[in-house]
């Protein structure tokens, strides 16, 4: 009690101290210092005016009455004109509030008094959204029965069914969605589609007609950034929308995108160089209001924006300095950029119309001959030049002044467009190569405009028009004026052609240097122009070298000749001839037997042809696949002719046989001096016949390159001490071989008429038979070698060809065997006719030996023919298919073996892993056992100690019991 009284005294003392502190503050206040009269007057004035009254707005009174459920007060307010759909600061109506409060009676009262059931608040929520979120099923059914929409989307793109959590509510809403046929995806994208349509309309019209939201001041850019409409955002930025536009709170689109966590919108705005440090009215930057997971991304975007801004500033400085230097140096200084005012008579107005109609096509052409070009240059020199100022505005105004009335128009539509495009562009460098600006003007010609352009071009030719241009081609009269440049180009080209006529790039460089006025065209137009030039040409000789294929080849240089005049002719030809183009037909010079050098020299001496070739606009050389395959095939043929292990074809065999017979005839003629004396013109005639045949061969070999011949054969003649072995082409060697066989026949025919003895004739026949046996042995070896080579090369013929197909003599084996038989029978008959001379007196033994040799030869011939038939009857296709099937079987076996090997490896790895796991498990088990054993041993020792203590305790306990008993006895005795 004393303590309670003490505590109560302490509280009283603290209360008195607080009151004293209040009084002290009051004494120091301004109110206490005022005079008492003034305080009393103030109180009297306040009581006279009455207490102050607080007045609320009608909307707030209406919402308060609805919240309290006072229907009578609500009716009075509605009668006085209150809005039933009035909203509070958050956009909530009385119906929203009644739905949230689950006041079904007030909901029915408001709906019956025509409250809007689809009214949205500031977040886009309708009363049905609220009912679905709260799970009020009866209110939701009532809303749906009175026309509430289940497809309205709130600000976050959610429909009422998305907010429903209870299964019954979700089923009800989804059933109504199906019943009303509402497309929820379309409803979610409706706002974005509408904004996308408006943004495209603003972009196309060039005028942005956006209306800010009255409540928040938000723009379309704010909405697109906050909701992540990326496409709308890009279109609005492209239309020129202000990136840093602010709403009523000072928020920019970047604030909205950062606050709602839209990363893509932040990236788009930052890359468009928006202000990332701008502050709203509360002093917050986008970093301050951003979502926590987006701050690092914004910092990275700010660094990237700094880099982009510095690059843009550097680019702008370069552009400004470039423009300033160009304006200071003056525009269009050189003669190539000067404007010429064309003066054309009224009689040529129709020609100008034709030029206008054809100027829109994609062809760029030049004049037909140098006469028209020189006339154009003279007219351009005589025409007055328009004065050009450095200012673009003055230039354009002067051009407009110089353009006369439409009736006396001196410019075509294409030239006017050309002039306007010249002023809008920056000045091009002076020393630009022709190839660079020509490549910039390359266009693809329209195929259906070809005939129309060709007709207009012929009409312009007939009327004497000078140059035929396209709307995009620059004026090149100044280039034609520059005679020095033209001479340098011509001299350079004349030096360049003999050395560099091989590659496609050299051809392109030649065309660029030679014809600077030519413009690049498509292939179809080029062919059409060549046909037109061929039709209108007056010299038909120049059409022969030109073809319509674009396969350019290297031309081999001429061989050195003894005549100096021929060397000069070859040099002049190589510097003036155009490129050689392959055709499938032989050249006229080679077909007629005339050397190619003569034709080239005649073509090179024509000056009109040279001018035509220099002015002609060729198609830009393109790598031709056919030319590539042709080159590969020919190089393969050349490699085959160089190999020492190549096969001997039937043609080689026939040529060797005829050459061998010719050499044998020469030896026979040498052994018969009397026959030589009687007929000294035999061999001379044959050699005379051989020399003319060898001459055109040499000429053809020099005039024609190795690549122009379809098939190459290199013959190997028997080595002779007095006659070197030379390669002869088949077309050139056949006449000489025919003359050789003719010489043999004439020598044989002159044999019976000679005055030699029978013994010499018999010896000659015997030698001839011996040599024929050797030749037949060689023939057998060659034929067997040829057949084995054909077997080896058969697989190559079965391959798919990638280039031009070459015909070989190996394709028909039946014909080969028949030709071999005929050749062998012919030789046997010749030998028999030569050996059995009726005038000779040979012995019976000689005839028997000859018969034996003949039978041996027939046996060899039969074996050879049987071998040929076996080779011809062999089906290589079946062999190839069998090899393929065997190869496939081996592949499958290999795959199976590989699979088995992989399985075995996997099993081995698994077993090794299991073994390792077992060993590791065993070691771990051993460790555990060791630990348990140690623990048990420790426990045993502890238990032993406890047992010792227990025994001691038992002994102590017993001792204490004994003492206790003794004490009890003592006490009992004392008590007695």
From Swiss-Prot:
<comment type="function">
    <text>Regulates myosin phosphatase activity. Augments Ca(2+) sensitivity of the contractile apparatus.</text>
</comment>
<dbReference type="GO" id="GO:0007165">
    <property type="term" value="P:signal transduction"/>
</dbReference>
<keyword id="KW-0040">ANK repeat</keyword>
<feature type="modified residue" description="Phosphoserine">
    <location>
        <position position="941"/>
    </location>
</feature>
<feature type="compositionally biased region" description="Basic and acidic residues">
    <location>
        <begin position="818"/>
        <end position="830"/>
    </location>
</feature>
<feature type="compositionally biased region" description="Basic residues">
    <location>
        <begin position="632"/>
        <end position="642"/>
    </location>
</feature>
<feature type="modified residue" description="Phosphothreonine">
    <location>
        <position position="802"/>
    </location>
</feature>
<dbReference type="GO" id="GO:0019901">
    <property type="term" value="F:protein kinase binding"/>
</dbReference>
<feature type="repeat" description="ANK 5">
    <location>
        <begin position="249"/>
        <end position="278"/>
    </location>
</feature>
<protein>
    <recommendedName>
        <fullName>Protein phosphatase 1 regulatory subunit 12B</fullName>
    </recommendedName>
</protein>
<feature type="compositionally biased region" description="Basic and acidic residues">
    <location>
        <begin position="375"/>
        <end position="385"/>
    </location>
</feature>
<feature type="compositionally biased region" description="Basic and acidic residues">
    <location>
        <begin position="844"/>
        <end position="860"/>
    </location>
</feature>
<keyword id="KW-0597">Phosphoprotein</keyword>
<dbReference type="GO" id="GO:0030018">
    <property type="term" value="C:Z disc"/>
</dbReference>
<feature type="compositionally biased region" description="Basic and acidic residues">
    <location>
        <begin position="622"/>
        <end position="631"/>
    </location>
</feature>
<feature type="compositionally biased region" description="Low complexity">
    <location>
        <begin position="411"/>
        <end position="423"/>
    </location>
</feature>
<dbReference type="Pfam" id="PF15898">
    <property type="entry name" value="PRKG1_interact"/>
</dbReference>
<feature type="modified residue" description="Phosphothreonine">
    <location>
        <position position="645"/>
    </location>
</feature>
<feature type="compositionally biased region" description="Polar residues">
    <location>
        <begin position="747"/>
        <end position="763"/>
    </location>
</feature>
<feature type="repeat" description="ANK 3">
    <location>
        <begin position="123"/>
        <end position="152"/>
    </location>
</feature>
<feature type="compositionally biased region" description="Low complexity">
    <location>
        <begin position="465"/>
        <end position="477"/>
    </location>
</feature>
<dbReference type="InterPro" id="IPR036770">
    <property type="entry name" value="Ankyrin_rpt-contain_sf"/>
</dbReference>
<dbReference type="InterPro" id="IPR031775">
    <property type="entry name" value="PRKG1_interact"/>
</dbReference>
<feature type="compositionally biased region" description="Basic residues">
    <location>
        <begin position="791"/>
        <end position="801"/>
    </location>
</feature>
<feature type="modified residue" description="Phosphothreonine">
    <location>
        <position position="444"/>
    </location>
</feature>
<dbReference type="GO" id="GO:0019208">
    <property type="term" value="F:phosphatase regulator activity"/>
</dbReference>
<keyword id="KW-0677">Repeat</keyword>
<feature type="region of interest" description="Disordered">
    <location>
        <begin position="1"/>
        <end position="52"/>
    </location>
</feature>
<feature type="region of interest" description="Disordered">
    <location>
        <begin position="503"/>
        <end position="873"/>
    </location>
</feature>
<feature type="compositionally biased region" description="Basic and acidic residues">
    <location>
        <begin position="765"/>
        <end position="777"/>
    </location>
</feature>
<feature type="region of interest" description="Disordered">
    <location>
        <begin position="342"/>
        <end position="489"/>
    </location>
</feature>
<feature type="compositionally biased region" description="Basic and acidic residues">
    <location>
        <begin position="480"/>
        <end position="489"/>
    </location>
</feature>
<dbReference type="Pfam" id="PF12796">
    <property type="entry name" value="Ank_2"/>
</dbReference>
<feature type="modified residue" description="Phosphoserine">
    <location>
        <position position="833"/>
    </location>
</feature>
<keyword id="KW-0963">Cytoplasm</keyword>
<comment type="subunit">
    <text>PP1 comprises a catalytic subunit, PPP1CA, PPP1CB or PPP1CC, and one or several targeting or regulatory subunits. PPP1R12B mediates binding to myosin. Isoform 3 and isoform 4 bind PPP1R12A, but not isoform 1 of PPP1R12B itself. Binds IL16.</text>
</comment>
<feature type="compositionally biased region" description="Acidic residues">
    <location>
        <begin position="362"/>
        <end position="374"/>
    </location>
</feature>
<dbReference type="GO" id="GO:0031672">
    <property type="term" value="C:A band"/>
</dbReference>
<feature type="compositionally biased region" description="Polar residues">
    <location>
        <begin position="722"/>
        <end position="739"/>
    </location>
</feature>
<feature type="modified residue" description="Phosphoserine">
    <location>
        <position position="502"/>
    </location>
</feature>
<feature type="repeat" description="ANK 2">
    <location>
        <begin position="90"/>
        <end position="119"/>
    </location>
</feature>
<feature type="repeat" description="ANK 4">
    <location>
        <begin position="216"/>
        <end position="245"/>
    </location>
</feature>
